[in-house]
Amino acid sequence: MKIAAIIPSRYGSTRFAGKPLAPIAGIPMIQRVYDQVKQAICVTDIAVATDDRRIVEAVTRFGGNALMTSAACRSGTDRAAEAAKQMGLAPEDIVVNIQGDQPLIAPQTIDETLAPLLSDPDLGMTTAAFAIMDKQEITNPKDVKMVFDADGFALYFSRSPIPFARDKDTRFDTFKHLGIYAYTRRFLDIFTQLPNGVLEEIEKLEQLRALEHSHRIKTVVTRYDSPEVDIPEDIPRIEAMMASMAAD
């Protein structure tokens, strides 16, 4: 069985054009992500999926594998599905979809997210969550929050703070959704054929499509955060975190 990590990467961004090639401590962000993914123990294949030749050339320069996909892909998941088809993955193979703007994605998180699919072949999709430590992230709509049931299956994802504590002295963890998914190739093909959901369109969160169509998403809680780069101003923060990690 193959376990393919696919990193969807788009050059055009309204908030940060050319983001995948932006240097982080002198190295393109897409290379930072790729290098983190290479350290995951369970991953057998890696590919960057893009619709831009500049990204293909950058990945090729550092010795990585890049696939050209259609500019018509609606989302990173659609791009990952197209790449999985190009790679000839079998229905039982596993695809890990890792957003290309997470230069600090922990290899351990990748392996942890995969684990439920390896132990339970009936699962179709998994993801990861992190208990928020920076309270500003709870109210920031770019940080997606999630709740899950007692068995670890996702109940909802939202840009709003969830759950809401009616009693202000209630103590609980708020979980941030991390930008990583793992699916069987079979389920990935099913997912991309589903019509968009109402909640998905309201929140602009494609993972809600699975829940709205009664598919379950197993959630793994990791102790490793994975901050994203959304705008140029995020890069100094990431570089500072890298420097702090190197000093420890």
Swiss-Prot record:
Disulfide bonding pattern of the chain: none
SUPFAM superfamilies linked to this entry: Nucleotide-diphospho-sugar transferases
Enzyme class, spelled out: transferase
GO molecular function, one term: 3-deoxy-manno-octulosonate cytidylyltransferase activity
Protein keywords: Cytoplasm, Lipopolysaccharide biosynthesis, Nucleotidyltransferase, Transferase
Family that this chain belongs to: Belongs to the KdsB family.
Protein name: 3-deoxy-manno-octulosonate cytidylyltransferase
Taxonomic path: Bacteria, Pseudomonadati, Thermodesulfobacteriota, Desulfobacteria, Desulfobacterales
